[in-house]
């Protein structure tokens, strides 16, 4: 094999590894965004019910606390919301 062919193969492998890493990071961030949207919707729902009825919904509070107590999606990420 010529050095140019070896270099091309190595470059493709490196590009593939970088693509996998980037898409993994994108997926982790997307999951965080979806989780935060779900938490925001539950908070809004609790606020609406509190305004309407004068008390808060126990089921929504339990679901919200379960989401918040779930922990980190990525254990190496210490900047959690």
Curated annotation (Swiss-Prot):
This is Protein Vpu. The keyword Signal does not apply. Phosphorylated by host CK2. This phosphorylation is necessary for interaction with human BTRC and degradation of CD4. GO terms for molecular function: CD4 receptor binding; monoatomic cation channel activity. The N-terminus and transmembrane domains are required for self-oligomerization and proper virion budding, whereas the cytoplasmic domain is required for CD4 degradation. The cytoplasmic domain is composed of 2 amphipathic alpha helix that form a U-shape. The gene is vpu. It is a single-pass type I membrane protein. Enhances virion budding by targeting host CD4 and Tetherin/BST2 to proteasome degradation. Degradation of CD4 prevents any unwanted premature interactions between viral Env and its host receptor CD4 in the endoplasmic reticulum. Degradation of antiretroviral protein Tetherin/BST2 is important for virion budding, as BST2 tethers new viral particles to the host cell membrane. Mechanistically, Vpu bridges either CD4 or BST2 to BTRC, a substrate recognition subunit of the Skp1/Cullin/F-box protein E3 ubiquitin ligase, induces their ubiquitination and subsequent proteasomal degradation. Belongs to the HIV-1 VPU protein family. Keywords: AIDS, Apoptosis, Host membrane, Host-virus interaction, Inhibition of host innate immune response by virus, Inhibition of host tetherin by virus, Ion channel, Ion transport, Membrane, Phosphoprotein, Transmembrane, Transmembrane helix, Transport, Viral immunoevasion. HIV-1 lineages are divided in three main groups, M (for Major), O (for Outlier), and N (for New, or Non-M, Non-O). The vast majority of strains found worldwide belong to the group M. Group O seems to be endemic to and largely confined to Cameroon and neighboring countries in West Central Africa, where these viruses represent a small minority of HIV-1 strains. The group N is represented by a limited number of isolates from Cameroonian persons. The group M is further subdivided in 9 clades or subtypes (A to D, F to H, J and K). GO terms for biological process: receptor catabolic process; symbiont-mediated suppression of host innate immune response; symbiont-mediated suppression of host type I interferon-mediated signaling pathway; symbiont-mediated-mediated suppression of host tetherin activity; viral release from host cell. Residues 29-81 are cytoplasmic. The chain crosses the membrane at residues 8-28. Residues 1-7 are extracellular. The modification Phosphoserine is found at residues 53, 57. InterPro entries: Vpu, Vpu_cyt_dom_sf. It is found in: Host membrane. It comes from Human immunodeficiency virus type 1 group M subtype B (isolate JRCSF).
